[in-house]
C-alpha cells in the first residue's frame, strides 16, 4: 500500500470489503508503508480478519518481523536505499536467523532490491538448501 494509506477504520473496512469481494478465503498479506499500521489495535484487527502484515526491510520503516495468522513474509527492499541495495552476507544471515527463530507455518523472504538481487538471491538459496 502507498504511504498515504494510513491506519483508519475506513481503510481497515476497505481491506475487509476487498477481501470479501475478491472471495479471498485464504490468508492475505499486505505491505503497509506507513507505520500507523504497526500498533496493537490494528494488528489484532488485521489478524481477526485474516490479513497478515508483510515485514519489510527498507529505509525509514520499522524493522519488525510480523507473525500474523501463522505467516511470516519478509520483503527486502534495501536497508539504506529503496531497490538499489546490495545486502552484505552478514545482513542476510541476521535476517534469516531472526525469521528462523520465529514459529510460523509459512515463512518467506522475498528480495526486491533490484540491483543486488542476483548475488543476494544466490546466497539465500545456498543457505536455505543447505
Each PLM stretch: what is its role?
Residues 1-130:
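Residues lining hydrophobic/aromatic ligand-binding pockets adjacent to catalytic sites
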